[in-house]
Curated annotation (Swiss-Prot):
Bias type Pro residues, positions: 554-575
Lineage: Eukaryota, Metazoa, Chordata, Craniata, Vertebrata
Organism whose genome encodes this protein: Mus musculus
Name this protein carries in UniProt: Ankyrin repeat domain-containing protein 13B
Compartment(s) of residence: Cell membrane; Late endosome; Early endosome
Keyword terms: Acetylation, ANK repeat, Cell membrane, Endosome, Membrane, Repeat
Domain of life per record: Eukaryota
Gene Ontology annotations of biological process type: negative regulation of receptor internalization
Gene designation per UniProt: Ankrd13b
SMART domains assigned to the protein according to its UniProt record, in alphabetical order: ANK, UIM
Length: 626
């Protein structure tokens, strides 16, 4: 046992007492040391790991259990950017993954509840408003843009109440999930009511979030993951995607040619906006597969679409330093035999030796340029009015999470009336704010507040005329009925499970495979060629698609999950003799599709060059005549 004056002793047991006990798997002594509370449970060792990270990487289950029970943060990342859960999955220890997943979801619920008072205060102080957020997806592959979905989020904010309407819910079972839904957040003094209104089924799922008095054991019991959730993680690659913005820079876009260039401005929904370009934005996707069996590795490779293989994304494959093939064996932790003295010595270089199982890592990096349209005279405030809403939506929506990560950067002055940011490796999202307070198009239950323009007696009293001035758009009144359960709807006491928040690679695959325009129903499986040409699905299903298990967080104690909606069965797979024919047809379809894309892109560039040359010739002639 470490003595009381351990901190005064030299060596790792004095500098890093918790890490030292974890290293030697002395969980009983670790329990006593943590209970004493004299050492920071989130202390970092010389390799950038917390005690919990080290316990997880080494596969020391009981040490991890002690640290989690005393509040160690599951969400912390190590120096390499991996979370505790991702490291747990890489150990292939089912019990450890189940334990970490349980505490991760528990801590998410606790943080969610703890953040409600601050959110309520921000909503209370902010001015009431209505705004529409239009999401459009674009791509550098011209024809891919035509199959991407679009949606308009309608946002009402009144006092401590918030409502968001949407039709694009997410992705599940290889289909875009469409539906007419409203999400209502109604703040109260000591609690908050969250409602999900399903207008298609005329059902309201209601949940009350108490701000105090939550029983820890009940929350932990509700956070217990199912065996399917754990197995789905152990049989799938560990994937993390992040926007690297440490070198990002914003510059004003220019317009004109030669010596007549000026800073570019555009009108966006009636507001004059300065156009900025953001450079040095990198989208980095890292995939780890050392925990997968050869069978599951084969499935992962088979699930890679021809289009994903075709894309010119820089790939760097990392493996052991000797370059030999890694066999999937249940090797014990710390295979390079790193000693405690070597590990805890900050001056000792470990080189390529790593803790835990030998890592198999694939890194994909692609540089993007983002664009911003900023209006300095816009009535809305990004920090006070819009940011709290994006924070709330980002909890369960991957797209809003990407948007939040971007707007938290130090942007140039002004409100971003339009933003274009990378979401996946070939897809950008363009978000446009418009119809503020119903000034462009009438909106039911929204009207100008006293002092602003009031509709005439013969007009619709529930909306503001589209001819309203900018000044009249600065304030509005919103009907309280918007934040109540609609009449005639069935109200259920527990909210059903939300649509799973899929990994980015899932979203990319689904975006390519599904046509949401006129290419059949949303449940049809389409080939790449059918998706790119927006034609009716053929008879061959996509043989490389795989189903992703539900990885959504378990419900809180108040929830009673509803049975999931029935999903149509997939079409039968083709016979053994037809598989090679299917893959050959995909390669041919892909080649033709990319040729068409390249031709369309080249034609667009040719027209731009021709226009620039014509304009330059006219300018030269005008100067000659003078």
């Amino acid at each position: 046992m470490i003595p009381a004056n351990a901190s005064a002793r030299k060596g790792p047991e004095g500098k890093y007492p918790l890490h030292y006990l974890v290293w030697h798997n002395r969980h009983r002594e670790l329990e006593k040391e943590v209970r004493a509370g004299q050492v920071d449970i989130e202390q970092l060792d010389p390799r950038g790991r917390t005690p919990l990270h080290l316990a997880t990487t080494l596969g020391h289950l009981e040490c991890a259990r002690v640290l989690l029970a005393h509040g160690a943060d599951v969400g912390r990342e190590n120096r390499s950017g991996w979370t505790v859960l991702q490291e747990a999955v890489s150990t292939r220890d089912l019990e450890l993954v189940q334990l970490v997943l349980r505490y991760r979801d528990y801590q998410r619920v606790v943080k969610r509840l703890a953040g409600i008072p601050m959110l309520l205060e921000k909503l209370r102080k902010a001015q009431d408003f209505y705004v529409e957020m239009k999401w459009e997806f674009t791509s550098w592959v011209p024809l891919v843009s035509k199959i991407c979905p679009s949606d308009t989020y309608k946002v009402w904010k009144s006092g401590q109440n918030l409502r968001v309407d949407t039709t694009l819910l997410g992705f599940d079972h290889m289909t875009w999930q469409r539906g007419n839904r409203s999400f209502v957040f109604r703040g109260q003094d000591t609690s908050a009511v969250v409602m999900e209104i399903d207008h298609d089924r005329r059902v309201v799922y209601m949940e009350t979030l108490a701000l105090a008095g939550q029983d820890r054991e009940l929350l932990l019991a509700a956070a217990q993951p199912s065996e399917e959730q754990v197995l789905s993680r152990l049989t799938a690659p560990v994937v993390t995607t992040q926007l690297d913005t440490k070198n990002i820079s914003f510059e004003r876009n220019k317009t004109g040619i030669l010596g007549w260039r000026s800073e570019k401005t555009e009108m966006v929904n009636g507001y004059e906006a300065k156009v900025y370009g953001a450079s040095n934005v990198e989208l980095i996707t890292r995939t780890r597969t050392e925990h997968l069996s050869e069978q599951h590795k084969g499935k992962v490779k088979g699930c890679k679409t021809p289009l994903q293989s075709f894309l010119g994304i820089a790939e760097q494959h990392g493996g052991p330093q000797n370059g030999t093939l890694i066999t999937q064996t249940l090797s014990q932790a710390n295979p390079p035999a790193i000693t405690a003295e070597e590990y805890f010595n900050p001056n000792f270089e470990l080189g390529n030796r790593a803790m835990g199982r030998p890592m198999e890592l694939t890194t994909k990096t692609q540089k993007f340029k983002a664009k911003l349209w900023l209006c300095e005279e816009h009535p809305l405030s990004l920090c006070e009015q819009v940011a709290p809403i994006i924070d709330l939506m980002a909890v369960s929506n991957a797209l809003f999470a990407k948007l939040r990560d971007f707007i938290t950067l130090r942007l140039p002055p002004g409100f971003p009336v339009k933003i274009e940011i990378p979401i996946f490796h070939i897809l950008n999202a363009r978000i446009t704010f418009g119809n503020l307070n119903g000034c462009d198009e009438p909106v039911p239950s929204v009207r100008g507040s006293p002092g602003s323009e009031t509709p005439s007696p013969g007009s619709d009293s529930s909306s503001v005329s589209s001819s309203s001035s900018t000044t009249s758009c600065r304030a509005c009144e919103i009907s309280p009925a918007l934040f109540e359960a609609p009449r005639g709807y069935s109200v259920l006491g527990g909210q059903r499970e939300a649509v799973p928040r899929d990994e980015d690679d899932d979203l990319l695959r689904f975006a390519i495979q599904q046509s949401l325009l006129e290419a059949g129903s949303e449940y049809d499986q389409v080939t790449i060629w059918e998706a790119l040409t927006n034609s009716k699905p053929g008879t061959h299903p996509m043989s490389y698609e795989g189903r992703r298990q539900d990885r959504s967080a378990p419900p809180t104690p108040q929830r009673q999950p509803m049975p999931p909606a029935p999903v149509p069965s997939p079409r039968p797979s083709p016979g053994p003799g037809s598989s090679s024919h299917v893959f050959r047809s995909y390669d041919e379809q892909l080649r033709l599709a990319m040729e068409l894309s390249a031709q369309e892109q080249e034609e667009r560039r040719r027209r731009v060059r021709q226009e620039e040359e014509e304009l330059e010739r006219i300018l030269r002639l005008s100067l000659t005549e003078q």
